[in-house]
Amino acid sequence: MRRTYGGQLWVASLAAASALTLLAARASAFCRSSTCQADSTCDYDEHGCPVGGHPTVWHRSCITFSVQEDGSPRMHITAEKAGQILEQAYGSWTNASCEDGTPSIQAFRLDPVSCNRPQVNLCDRNASIWIFHDDVWPYEDDDLTLALTWTHFDPGTGEILDTDVEVNTAQHVITTDPKGMGAQFVAIATHEIGHIFGLAHSPYLYATMFENYRLTNDMSELSNDDIQGICTLYPPDRKTGPCVPEPLNGFASDCGTERCDPEGCCSTAPGGNSGSKGGAMLLTGLGLLVGWRRRSGRRRSNLL
């Protein structure tokens, strides 16, 4: 299915390495991601939640994901194994118990893909990809980051169009063995999927969406705070169209075009954006940290 958007379309990739400040817990602490995080124009409330812009959310009733076909040889994680764990992690969110049912969004796994970088093609086919970086983590000053989610959206509405996740297996030991040493991939995945659905970091210490990885509890088990967040974003009675389980403009295994055509359609990826009419803007990413980092001038989230 091919979709078009009127006016100027920008895409942002939201790197949530927000300040590592421990805020007081409250009964309901979930925060929503916003378009204002793309250009750092947000204000922040007393709980650290972004204020301003449009909240980011999927308008459709189902989304898809794929694993990059190489998986992580260094961590002995095959694409198939990762896909199985991701199905479990997505299910934690989509099967959450809301007051009147379950969230009005589903997730479907598609075939592994050859594309090994995050991007969105506005005029071509796409894939929402989980990518493992075994050799080099491609971002500077990010040795604490376990994973990073890139959210591509329409800044005029906040509608999420595409997401990609990068996992830092170059600098961290990440395991799929529940008794193994290292960070649990299922916990990392569950946190990043919260970003995929439009949640920002929560100040609630025991939430899956807390920005730091914890060894003291299982982050793959949603807290009441996380459940309230997903049920608020996707209430069971939300009006949506029929489920079409394919990415924006259809599914592609390769990375597709990287240049704008004469009409202004293009792809966008971390590290660049297009100012052309109908082009795309990269928002930056949200992630999970393995440790504490002092507040810096930029907003980004690291999962520990």
Regions found by a protein language model. Give the residues of each.
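Cytoplasmic C-terminal tails of single-pass
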Residues: R298-L304
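N-terminal low-hydrophobic presequence detector
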Residues: R3-G7, H191, L304
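Zinc-dependent metalloendopeptidases
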Residues: A25-G279
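C-terminal segment of classical bacterial N-terminal signal peptides
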Residues: S18-A27, W292
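A cross-kingdom C-terminal cell-surface attachment/processing module
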Residues: G278-R295
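Bacterial N-terminal signal peptides
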Residues: A12-T21, T284-G287
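Bacterial N-terminal signal peptides that target proteins for export
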Residues: R2-L14, G275-G279
